[in-house]
Amino acid sequence: MENNLVRTGTLEHKNVVMANALTRSAQGLNLAEKRILFSAIAKMGNNFGKGEVYLYATEYAETFGLAPNQAYEQLKENVRNMRTRYFTLAPQDRTEGNGVKRRGKRGMVWEINWFQKIGYHDGDGMIGLKFTDDVIPYLHDLEREFTKYKLKQACALRSVYSWRLLELFEQHTGNAGKGWWAVSVEDFCDSMEAPDAMRKNFGKLRSQIIQPAIDELVKKDGWLIGFEAIKEGRKVVRLRFDFERDPQGNLF
């Protein structure tokens, strides 16, 4: 039987690997759904086989610090919604002269379902997931333009915004553990799937998404983060993040 289908221990030391286009995409997930999806990706590693994976409540509980009964309830409750979840790929990215990555506004926008089918087994305390054929090229056998991090880095996070920011930082982190990311406010909001009220009010965006996410990554995943809001006139139009691993940290 494939390792994807058997019970293992904690998944926290396994890697999450995905194409950069997927990292930037709107993923359409709440925190529990994101935990399930990326646990599945981490468990499969590079052994996708038929695109099927089983997640056991014991694995999920050990990974995210939950009681087994609570873990299975969370798995079963959320997996039922994941059959219809999808990610959104914007038109081809482009880079402006100031180095800011900006998404194209013309061209096809694709909405791609994560899973072809889902299942659950009350007796064995597990769920089953089968990825769609369209998503596998963004997760499997990647040679370039990909984001990689250990699931452990996200296990303690309590905000999906923090997790999204972690992924975007990892996409732009160099071999020395340092990096920077400049992005338009519009594209940042798209990647973070910010509500309309925050898109229209930078003060709310900063206080309810940006700063809490920065604070959580500093506290729980050992980052040093600098942040700048860049204005044109009186309006904030771009963001710049500078980040590196805290040399005093011992997470790994």
Q: Model segments located where?
A:
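Charged, alpha-helix-forming regions
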Residues: 1-252
